[in-house]
Amino acid sequence: MKNLLGCSVKDLENVALNYGQAAFRGRQIYSWLYNYKNRSKSIDEINVLPLNFRNQLKKEGFIFGELILKEKYLANDGTLKLLLNTRDNESVECVGIPTEKRLTACLSSQVGCPMDCKFCATGKEGLKRSLKASEILDQILFIENEMNQKVTNIVFMGMGEPLLNIDELLFSIRSINEDFDVSQRRITVSTVAIPNMIRKLSEMSFQVLGKCQFTLAISLHASNQKTRETIIPSAKNYHIKYIIDDCREFVKKTGRRVSFEYLMLHGVNDKLEHADELSNLIKGFQCHVNLIQYNQIEEVEFKQTPSKNAQLFQNRLSNNGINVSLRKSRGSDRNAACGQLRQNAKIK
């Protein structure tokens, strides 16, 4: 199979030329593939193309995406979780999060995850494989088609560790920006932090994309190394001090602030002394803290921080001069919230 999803307009012009067609036929394919209001789901539906050209493309194995919708779950707040099957019969999940003026797509970069964070459902069954860029982009098509709305924002916060699939990640970002017409500034890449990869991400972004304007979000979740190691096993390989050093360098290179994701776990990392410790750790450079209320999952005994305590924690950070917000959880009643995505439909 030759997936056209992810092809640039120039790529598709070349496809047309290779089959004896005029270049504008490639531009027609491009429009029918990426234009939300004029999108087709298969080559057969592009009726502006000559029939013989459509038949040639199908005979040569060209397709418009390769994921298959298996299940969908609509939460009370309008959040939609989709369970998609790959051609090798693996499963991946993505989430559409609507608000009044935008639609955020939460995308997966891998089938499963190797990081085994103790508070997250995704890593419970380990990593199966990384996704191809076309499989990442296909998630956007499904969200737009199912929600009948154009995606305006992208967060790589679904299944998997994006920086362990960096080539396909950056190819996806290029297409999201240029083909799906979503500004890099509306794209967020979330990582638990992999040694040497934060620096590599900024370097490769300039090489592949020509710029680095997306938001880097670090899944920090602790104010010190000891606590972080207890909830994120991979933290043993990358000291929290060096993560912050690399983030400072990222800001210098890109001019973009770094976001720190901080999942509040009652009795683990949510005391005011942790807020002070976190403030001292990250002060002095352009950053923002996203406090996240824990979403309960099976097999895990962590408890959600009471709202009153979370507000006190937020106030302490703010009083310490840290830009901070308390993120409202979406879709938790359908296991579509942060930390609840997994490879199968066992939990519904």
Swiss-Prot record:
GO MF term list: 4 iron, 4 sulfur cluster binding; metal ion binding; rRNA (adenine(2503)-C2-)-methyltransferase activity; rRNA binding; tRNA (adenine(37)-C2)-methyltransferase activity; tRNA binding
Ranges for domain Radical SAM core: 99-333
Chief subcellular location: cytoplasm
Superkingdom, taxonomy of origin: Bacteria
Keywords (A to Z) from UniProt: 4Fe-4S, Cytoplasm, Disulfide bond, Iron, Iron-sulfur, Metal-binding, Methyltransferase, rRNA processing, S-adenosyl-L-methionine, Transferase, tRNA processing
PANTHER family in alphabetical order: 23S RRNA METHYLTRANSFERASE, RADICAL SAM CORE DOMAIN-CONTAINING PROTEIN
Amino acids binding [4Fe-4S] cluster: 113, 117, 120
Leading EC class: transferase
NCBIfam families linked to this entry: rRNA_mod_RlmN (TIGR00048)
Function, as annotated: Specifically methylates position 2 of adenine 2503 in 23S rRNA and position 2 of adenine 37 in tRNAs.
Co-factor binding comment: Binds 1 [4Fe-4S] cluster. The cluster is coordinated with 3 cysteines and an exchangeable S-adenosyl-L-methionine.
Cystine connections: 106-338
GO biological process, one term: rRNA base methylation
Similarity comment text for this entry: Belongs to the radical SAM superfamily. RlmN family.
Documented EC number(s): 2.1.1.192
Protein name, UniProt field: Probable dual-specificity RNA methyltransferase RlmN
Organism, scientific name: Prochlorococcus marinus (strain MIT 9515)
Active site positions: 93, 338
GO cellular component: a single term: cytoplasm
Residues annotated as binding S-adenosyl-L-methionine: 160-161, 190, 219-221, 295
Subcellular localization: Cytoplasm
Reported cofactor(s): [4Fe-4S] cluster
Catalytic activity reported: adenosine(2503) in 23S rRNA + 2 reduced [2Fe-2S]-[ferredoxin] + 2 S-adenosyl-L-methionine = 2-methyladenosine(2503) in 23S rRNA + 5'-deoxyadenosine + L-methionine + 2 oxidized [2Fe-2S]-[ferredoxin] + S-adenosyl-L-homocysteine; adenosine(37) in tRNA + 2 reduced [2Fe-2S]-[ferredoxin] + 2 S-adenosyl-L-methionine = 2-methyladenosine(37) in tRNA + 5'-deoxyadenosine + L-methionine + 2 oxidized [2Fe-2S]-[ferredoxin] + S-adenosyl-L-homocysteine
UniProt keyword S-adenosyl-L-methionine present: yes
Additional information: Reaction proceeds by a ping-pong mechanism involving intermediate methylation of a conserved cysteine residue.
